[in-house]
Every structure is written in C-alpha cells, then in structure tokens.
Design a protein with these regions (language model features):
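Catalytic-core regions of core metabolic enzymes
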Residues: 1-298
Length: 298
C-alpha cells in the first residue's frame, strides 16, 4: 500500500530546466518514477532528455498528462506562487523542495490551501520515496532529492524534519535487512504543509507499515503533539530521535524552525515527552534503527 505515493504515481516537475531540478528529475527517471511532465514558463514545447514534454503552465501539463503529483524546484521568491499554481491546477500532492521561502509567503500559502484537495509536503524538505522491488529499490517512486539506492522495500515508515537524518535512518534499516514502506521528509521550516501527526496517522492506517521511525529536532511542538496523539491512537511500535541536544536557547541551528523558544522546544523536553508517550527514544543518530528493532521485538 505505502502512503501518499506509489509506483503508479504520475509526477510533474516545476523548474525542470534549472540545474538542480534537471539533476533530480533525471535521477527520479532513472529510479523508475513515472515522470510525465515538466513545467518551465517560456520553455513549452521542448522535451527533457528527449522524453518528458515541457509545458509553460501546470494546468496545461495536468490536462495533457494527468499528473497527480508535483515536485517544485523553483527559487525562493517564486516558490509560493508555484505551490499555488499547482493547487489551482488540481495537483493532489505538491512537494516543495525549495529552501528559504519567506515566512509571510508560506503564511499566504497555508491559508490558501485551507480546505483544498491538494496536500503540500515541505517546503525545505528532501521529499518522499516509496521504494520499488527492483535492484537498489528501483521501480518505486522518488519525489525530491533523497538518494534512491539506499532504500529497500519493506514495512517501516519513516517521517522526519531532517533530510540527512532521514537518509541515515533508511540506510541503517536497509543494512540490517529491514525495508521501508514510505519515507516522508516533511521539512524543517516553521510553517509547513504536512506535520508529523498527519504522517503518523497515515502510517497507522497503512496495512503495509508495521513500525515507524519519527525524527524531529528542537523548535516547535510538532513532535510533542504527534507523540501525545500516538499514545492514544497508534498501535504500531515507534522509535524517535530528537536532534539538537546541545543547541543553546534562542539560536537557530540549521533549519529555520530549529530554534528553542518555549519549555517544550528543547531536545531534552521532547525526548522526555516522547518516552512518556511510549515511544522508544534513540540517544544518538546511529541508534535509530537499532532502537526501533528493540521496541519492535525483532
């Protein structure tokens, strides 16, 4: 089953002719993702790698190809409008990779998407991967920038605010012989489209997902909200990791949202609350998979 995406998901890439977008569109194609369209204003009629048609607008791309998901590789000043254009075109899943989108722009996007049929993942995220059954997990769906080859098809769901920690958890699981159902990078900005709790809910309802790794960091209360929800509603084993244990209060650490503001924003407080809610907490990044397997009884 997986969540959000599978091998049948049809993808368009906004910003496909930029160097970053082109690089990762090419990698997604090689992974086996059904990349059916690209969008760059003024480049309509061209083809990406002589295969994928490029359109001037998202609505034209959706009408011509039936794309159901979009990956956005658009510079920060234009990314909010790119998200809204995809939503207006009826794209079901919008994955925004762009980092550095102004907070006011994201507030406008968040309000505009309220009640919309479109789901936003990101911004400032690595995207999603549902591994395939081929060699190095090829044949699945890769949207974003995550390295596909470290994945393996299996039964562990991964949700994370951090891209690199997502890859670390995935690699550990794969090395130990345990694959992933879907890996979701929700992004590290203070305002994002999809949070930990929503992804946990999807994993909880997914018959293919048997266990979950949830990775968070200092700042905000998303992990705390998710843990308290899971205590009441999630029957599947969860391991958690919170980054930023040595971060000084009031200083941003990497992600725009990674800043200690309130009492429950610290790594120590989040780890304590996760443990109180029945989540097995890994003390270091290298312990994430091992901690899950211990809780899972594997």
């Amino acid at each position: 089953m997986a969540i959000l995406i599978d091998e049948n998901t049809t993808l368009l890439v906004q910003g496909i002719t930029g160097s970053f977008g082109a690089r990762h569109a090419s990698l997604s194609l090689a992974y086996g993702t059904k990349l059916v369209a690209g969008v760059t204003p003024g480049k309509g009629g061209q083809k990406f790698e002589n295969i994928v048609p490029i359109f001037n607008t998202v609505s034209k791309a959706v009408n011509e190809t039936g794309a159901t998901a979009s990956a956005i590789f658009v510079p920060p000043p234009f990314a909010a409008d790119a998200i809204l254009e995809a939503a207006d075109a009826g794209v079901e899943l919008i994955v925004c990779i762009t980092e550095g989108i102004p907070v006011m722009d994201m507030m406008r996007v968040k309000e505009a998407l309220r009640g919309s049929k479109s789901r936003l993942v990101g911004p400032n995220c690595p995207g999603l991967v549902t591994p395939g059954l081929g060699e190095k997990s090829h044949g699945g769906c890769r949207i974003g920038i995550a390295p596909g080859y470290i994945h393996k098809r299996g039964n562990v769901g991964v949700v994370s605010r951090s891209g690199t920690l997502t890859y670390e958890a995935v690699f550990q699981l794969t090395q130990l012989g345990y694959g992933q159902s879907t890996c979701v990078g929700i992004g590290g900005d203070p305002i994002n489209g999809t949070n930990h709790l929503e992804v946990l809910d999807m994993f909880n309802n997914d018959p293919e997902t048997e266990a979950i790794i949830m990775i968070g960091e200092i700042g905000g209360n998303a992990e705390v909200d998710a843990a308290r929800w899971a205590q009441q509603h999630c029957k599947k084993p969860i391991a958690g990791f919170i980054a930023g244990a040595t971060a000084p209060p009031g200083r941003r650490m990497g992600h725009a949202g990674a800043i200690v503001g309130g009492e429950e924003d610290t790594a120590q407080a989040k780890k304590r609350i996760l443990a109180e809610c029945g989540i097995a907490v890994a003390e270091t990044p290298s312990d994430m998979a091992k901690t899950l397997l211990e809780r899972w009884g594997k």
